[in-house]
Amino acid sequence: MRRKVLRDFVIGVLLLFVLPLAELSVAIAQESVFTVQQPDFQKSPYTGMTRQHWIQAGEYLLKGAFGYIHTLDDQMYFPKQLDKTYPNNDGQVPVAKLEGLARTLFIAAPLLKDNPELVMNGIRVADYYRHQLVGISNPKSPSFIPHRKGGPSQTLLELGSLAISMKAAQAVLWDPLTKAQKDSLAATMLSYGEGPTIGSNWMFFNVFILSFLKDQGYAVNESYLESNLKKLLARYRGEGWYNDAPAYDYYSAWAYQTYGPIWAEMFGKKQFPQLAQQFLANQHDMVANYPYMFSRDGKMNMWGRSICYRFAATAPLSLWEYDKSSDVNYGWIRRIASSTLLQFLENPKFLEEGVPTMGFYGPFAPAVQIYSCRG
């Protein structure tokens, strides 16, 4: 069980895209650089990082975001950094707030699974996220998201991300909601999950919404779910690499080779076992080459789109456990994951006012896209 919680936490931290930053009237003190307290070089000869240090790293990151949260109604919405990023108008603000909620929950969910009583900045973290989830479908809430109107949008991605976290910490985030609250939230999610998408990694977010709600007993468009899964698998090009319409970069890792195996483990083995097995087989193809994308000391290159996602590039490594293969050097991949995490957390430019910057180390416009948001 402890190993599973560690794996789930590793997934949560590695799936972190980039935390948002909020403008407050009261300035927040600059966070100190993360340090590994009492490293254990017997268990981890190179980094000293153990399970407990990974938990501390997650709390360190989440603490910065919660420095801006003082009530359950406060939203994870922060001023943009760099002109090219979004939001660029008032119409984009609601989804920017939703992105802040969804992306920070990628860290909070595994922490809550390990410690449901977690408190940050005087706020019970579980209460905060449940309150925000309920607010998504409440027209009177500042967190309200209306049902879909029109084509695919960023809202689809964030609701799909929430579905992952709600499954990962279901006993804390989803189960305590009333039936009416669940039904209302499900209706909002379905309006996007069953709606149009883009033929890239975006299809995963339709998949997670539909699979999660199917798992909870809701009627979903199963043919659309299966169709998106098959289209995602069709983008596989061999040796562990997917083509993301049309790019080859770390998206193959932090999207296809992360979301695919997570879907297989969370839902696929029960819902579509043959498709789940194919995702896991494709995952294993990475073992022979992907670790060599990192340096001898376990650090990553600045390569590809959305590089401000940073250590999300190591996300597939912790998921190789799903395959139960004997040819995986788990010590090596743990060393890579820990070294890449520390590559950023130990860099003094990584944080500004407690949260990550929009860049690789510090703010750096060439490392972000127009769809990048401090969320």
Role assignments for model-derived ranges:
Residues I11-E23:
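Bacterial N-terminal signal peptides
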Residues S25-I28:
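Sec/Tat signal peptide C-region and signal peptidase I cleavage site
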Residues F66, H70, L105-K113:
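Short amphipathic alpha-helical segments enriched in leucine
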Residues L319-G375:
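Extended polysaccharide-engagement surfaces of secreted carbohydrate-active enzymes
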